[in-house]
Amino acid sequence: MGSGTAPKGRRNHTPTHIKCRRCGKRSYNIKKGYCASCGFGRSRRMRKYSWSHKWKKKRNLL
């Protein structure tokens, strides 16, 4: 039939992302080995960009 629900049902049920050791968010990719939120595992510096203002709001810098 189609390639909708059935292939998704056969997918592996282990989580892609787990809790990050540095930022605490559930965005550490097990296969890639780095955090999508803070960049842990890829760089020593915290991942932040000028186009992303949530981190500024969190620290009351705006």
UniProtKB/Swiss-Prot annotation:
Q: Give the protein's biological function.
A: Binds to the 23S rRNA.
Q: Which UniProt keywords apply?
A: Metal-binding, Ribonucleoprotein, Ribosomal protein, RNA-binding, rRNA-binding, Zinc, Zinc-finger
Q: Where are the transmembrane segments?
A: none
The note on cofactor binding and number reads: Binds 1 zinc ion per subunit.
Q: Which residues bind Zn(2+)?
A: 20, 23, 35, 38
Supply the source organism for this entry: Thermococcus onnurineus (strain NA1)
- What do the Gene Ontology cellular component annotations say? cytosolic large ribosomal subunit
The record's section on InterPro entries has: Ribosomal_eL37 (IPR001569), Ribosomal_eL37/eL43 (IPR011331), Ribosomal_eL37_CS (IPR018267), Ribosomal_zn-bd (IPR011332)
**Which superkingdom does the taxonomy of this entry point to?**
Archaea
Zinc-finger ranges (C4-type): 20-38
Q: Which Pfam families match?
A: Ribosomal_L37e (PF01907)
Q: Which family does it belong to?
A: Belongs to the eukaryotic ribosomal protein eL37 family.
One GO MF term attached to the UniProt entry = structural constituent of ribosome
**Gene3D superfamilies linked to this entry:** 2.20.25.30
Q: What is this protein called?
A: Large ribosomal subunit protein eL37
Protein's UniProt keywords contain Amino-acid biosynthesis: no
| Example GO biological process | translation
Per its UniProt record, the required cofactor names are: Zn(2+)
